[in-house]
């Protein structure tokens, strides 16, 4: 089962992915993949980092500065991203009960290795929760269950995705810890 979540910037896509990861992990399942977080310098966003969900390893995805490749005002650090994201996704394919990819977006698409790894994830039978940049929605909507996240529906979407993931992993919503 694949779940794709999109929405406007700042609506809570990454927060939803982290909440799902934390809840599933608390229930005894192995969660793998990546989360992308903003880097802020004071009140201004100055870049993005990628974090491996299984190890906590951090790499730089993008920063404000000079260089290429670019997405808007950001320079994409393909090497920094690949150093963390590709092994994390590979480990998730091998070891995790569920794969989380936050985000499938224009910055990540600058990495050919990411595109290959994403292709393997999409071919696998492992449950997937992925956040998708709003400009790429049409490409991924047909591949699984799709949600457009808003401030009004984010708690409902969280509960629904969590319930469905529990079903896929052999749980019901009232299940206790896996032991």
Swiss-Prot record:
It catalyses: a ribonucleoside 5'-triphosphate + H2O = a ribonucleoside 5'-diphosphate + phosphate + H(+). Keywords: ATP-binding, Hydrolase, Nucleotide-binding. GO terms for molecular function: ATP binding; ATP hydrolysis activity. Its EC number is 3.6.1.15. Gene3D superfamilies: P-loop containing nucleotide triphosphate hydrolases. ATP binds at residues 7-14, 98-105. SMART domains: AAA. Belongs to the THEP1 NTPase family. NCBIfam families: PRK13695.1. Has nucleotide phosphatase activity towards ATP, GTP, CTP, TTP and UTP. May hydrolyze nucleoside diphosphates with lower efficiency. This is Nucleoside-triphosphatase THEP1. It comes from Pyrococcus abyssi (strain GE5 / Orsay).
């Amino acid at each position: 089962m694949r779940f794709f979540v999109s929405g406007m910037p700042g609506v809570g896509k990454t927060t939803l992915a982290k909440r799902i990861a934390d809840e599933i992990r608390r229930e005894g399942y192995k969660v793998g993949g990546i989360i992308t977080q903003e880097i802020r310098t004071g009140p201004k966003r100055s870049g993005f980092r990628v974090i491996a969900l299984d190890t906590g390893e951090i790499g730089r995805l993008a920063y404000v500065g000079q260089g290429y490749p670019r997405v808007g005002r950001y320079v994409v650090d393909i090497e920094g991203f690949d150093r963390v994201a590709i092994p994390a996704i590979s480990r998730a394919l091998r070891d995790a009960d569920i794969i989380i990819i936050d985000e499938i977006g224009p910055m990540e698409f600058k990495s050919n290795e990411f595109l290959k790894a994403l292709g393997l994830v999409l071919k696998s039978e492992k449950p997937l929760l992925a956040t998708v940049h709003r400009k790429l929605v049409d490409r991924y909507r047909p591949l699984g269950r799709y949600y457009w996240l808003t401030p009004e529906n984010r708690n409902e979407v969280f509960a629904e995705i969590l319930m469905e993931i529990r079903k896929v992993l052999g749980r019901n919503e009232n299940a206790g810890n896996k032991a």
